[in-house]
Amino acid sequence: MPTITAIAAGEARFNVLVSALQYVDTALPGTNLLGALSGASANLTVFAPTDAAFGQLAKDLGDTGSVTNETAVTSFLVGALPVETIRDVILYNASAGAKTLAQISANPTIATLNGQTITADGKTLTDKDPDLINPSLVQTNIAATNGIIHVIDRVLLPVNLPGNTDGTFTDIVAASGAFDTNGADFDLLLKAVQTTGLAGALANPTADLTVFAPNDAAFLKLAAALARSAPDHSP
């Protein structure tokens, strides 16, 4: 069974994460984050953001380039954030002790390696940035010899990072991305908004609105309820 570092280095979806680890270790001698994640006795839980998660963070911070280009995303983040902030973000995405999803659900307040906490609610993780969509767990319980990895679709942030501006309602809902199995995001709501022609009105930055936004799980419950209540026309 491989270590946490070996798993991250061996999967293309974690290229930006590995590059960030290497950058911090080089820029801050003695940090040795890669070494810590390789240690046989590390016993860590890592919430590992995908490349797409880092791309979304770059976009949130004002990157107008290609957020699917891993090299460009890494370069933007390195230029936009102090190395100490990148280090703290990485440490905030890790916790001492290997924790399965069941253990996280039983004890949802999680102490991280940078001294702050995150809170789990189902598969949603609440961080310290009040402006951006909270990360969701998209794959869980990946076992390593020295801990466990849970894959997340956005980067956990220990602070309200400068440069990230509040998006419009449409921006926030569209950030969910393409249709997937994550019931905590807003793929179905976005489709409904687009289908009804409301996307433009809800994208107006001067609109002063409160929106009660049902997530995908809520829409699926509605569909199931409507199916149960529909009349049976079978012969």
What are the residue ranges of the model-derived segments?
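Mature, structured domains of secreted/extracytosolic soluble proteins
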Residues: 1-235
